[in-house]
Amino acid sequence: MAGHSKWANIKRQKARVDAKKGKVFARLSRAIIVAARHGSADPNGNFQLRSAIDKAKAAGIPNENIDRAIAKGSGQLDAEGDQWEEIRYEGYGIGGVALLIEAMTDNRNRTAADLRAAFNKYGGNLGETGCVGWMFHQQGIISILGPVDEDQLLESLVETGADSYEFVEENAQAIAEVSTDVTVLETVTEALKAQDFQILDAEIRWIGEMSVAIADPDQAKSLIRLMDALEDLDDVQSVTANVEFMDNALAGL
């Protein structure tokens, strides 16, 4: 029985991994469709599309899937049923934390209902457009795989006009994150590539103007569960919160 139980657990874990992988593929494919629809189908002349393709390839999406998504977005392939649109939703979590949710949907009513259910379940509220948007600004973020020569990076950033940089660690990897104005994101990215920095990602992110400190473990748990629930929704592309968790709030989570 133990062996059977172990095998059942492995199958369930694999199903969860496969489901998550499927959602990632779907989100990245939709991002390619929208990018191709908004600009040129040639990634060389469309930075948004080029970035979406790079992310898709990094995630292991086959080239034929990428080509099909580009064809759908550019109108070269019948995309009936794939009329995706980008929508931003806003709301509050417990403790007054503001949340911005970026979604791609072919059914606004379905997406809004799913979001509202998640907010209600974890003590939040889905608000009207504009209720928290003023608490955030957009920033270009370029992620560079380390190790990075800081002197070389600083010299390059002075030349390109980037705003700032910081070193972070993600999945046990050292990464340099460069912040730029949105208008020069492409220029700075290409300049860093030309100087042989290994670019992992270049994207536009929402950044909170001020953070809300959460010290209570129960509030932290509710917020994390809310953000996880929102991110798990098929139509959701990203979730941003202006929250800073204090160390004691995360104890035991």
Curated annotation (Swiss-Prot):
The keyword Membrane does not apply. It is found in: Cytoplasm. It holds the Pfam family Transcrip_reg. GO terms for cellular component: cytosol. InterPro entries: Integrase-like_N, TACO1_YebC-like_2nd/3rd_dom, TACO1_YebC_N, Transcrip_reg_TACO1-like, Transcrip_reg_TACO1-like_dom3, YebC-like. GO terms for molecular function: DNA binding. The keyword Transcription applies. GO terms for biological process: regulation of DNA-templated transcription. Keywords: Cytoplasm, DNA-binding, Transcription, Transcription regulation. Belongs to the TACO1 family. NCBIfam families: PRK00110.1, PRK12378.1, YebC/PmpR family DNA-binding transcriptional regulator. This is Probable transcriptional regulatory protein AM1_1847.
